[in-house]
Swiss-Prot record:
PROSITE patterns (UniProt xref): ATPASE_DELTA
UniProt entry keywords in alphabetical sequence: ATP synthesis, Cell inner membrane, Cell membrane, CF(1), Hydrogen ion transport, Ion transport, Membrane, Transport
Name this protein carries in UniProt: ATP synthase subunit delta
Function: F(1)F(0) ATP synthase produces ATP from ADP in the presence of a proton or sodium gradient. F-type ATPases consist of two structural domains, F(1) containing the extramembraneous catalytic core and F(0) containing the membrane proton channel, linked together by a central stalk and a peripheral stalk. During catalysis, ATP synthesis in the catalytic domain of F(1) is coupled via a rotary mechanism of the central stalk subunits to proton translocation. This protein is part of the stalk that links CF(0) to CF(1). It either transmits conformational changes from CF(0) to CF(1) or is implicated in proton conduction.
Domain of life: Bacteria
Record-stated family: Belongs to the ATPase delta chain family.
Matches recorded under SUPFAM superfamilies: N-terminal domain of the delta subunit of the F1F0-ATP synthase
GO cellular component terms, A-Z: plasma membrane; proton-transporting ATP synthase complex
GO terms, molecular function: proton-transporting ATP synthase activity, rotational mechanism
Subunit structure: F-type ATPases have 2 components, F(1) - the catalytic core - and F(0) - the membrane proton channel. F(1) has five subunits: alpha(3), beta(3), gamma(1), delta(1), epsilon(1). CF(0) has four main subunits: a(1), b(1), b'(1) and c(10-14). The alpha and beta chains form an alternating ring which encloses part of the gamma chain. F(1) is attached to F(0) by a central stalk formed by the gamma and epsilon chains, while a peripheral stalk is formed by the delta, b and b' chains.
């Protein structure tokens, strides 16, 4: 299955595929998705956890021990916890963000959903998220799952990537367009 989807390839694709197939067989796809989303949010909120995940300085045993404590405190158990500990034991924890992205792509394909990567300057409210989902559903004809990334560098607006299509309505891009137009005119 990993070779069928270009977004699910390499080491992260193999791990994501194995996790997805296990979760599907055990009928816990949604629970694992929720746990991985919780872990992804924890990574975004904790520079120390991010350092633990990315740094080669920590050995596999130290990573697994620290990760076990973090997962217990967060209430992440079962297949999800065992999987994350396996990544640590195999020294592959640094690819966890790519594994989560690939896993979500597999889940979306399984459920007949589309996944859109959305970059915004600041966190969107629930009303705006629902409006964006509705607009994307109207375009694709499928339920759309949003992967939201906050990047203040885009200044305002948003960048939406859905499959091979991308719509960039960020203020940064508009300012760059004006800058290039002024250089050509002057």
């Amino acid at each position: 299955m990993a070779s069928e989807d270009p977004s699910v390839s390499g080491v992260s694709g193999r791990y994501a595929t194995a996790l997805f197939e296990l979760a599907r067989d055990e009928k816990v796809v949604d629970a694992v998705t929720a746990d991985l989303d919780k872990f992804k949010a924890m990574l975004a909120d904790s520079p120390d956890l991010l350092r633990l995940v990315r740094s080669p300085v920590f050995g596999a045993e130290a990573q697994a021990k620290a990760l076990g404590a973090v997962l217990d405190k967060a209430g992440i158990t079962g297949i999800s916890a065992n999987f994350l500990k396996l990544l640590a034991a195999n020294r592959r924890l640094f690819v966890v963000a790519d594994v989560i992205r690939a896993y979500r792509a597999l889940v979306a394909k399984f459920k007949g959903e589309a996944t859109a990567d959305v970059t915004v300057a600041e966190t969107l409210g629930d009303k705006n998220l629902e409006a964006l989902k509705a607009a994307l559903k109207a375009v694709t004809g499928k339920d759309v799952t949003l992967n939201i990334n906050v990047d203040p560098a885009i200044i305002g607006g948003l960048v939406v990537k859905l499959g091979s299509r991308m719509v960039d309505s960020s203020i940064r891009t508009k300012l760059n367009s004006i800058k290039h137009a002024m250089k050509e005119a002057g």
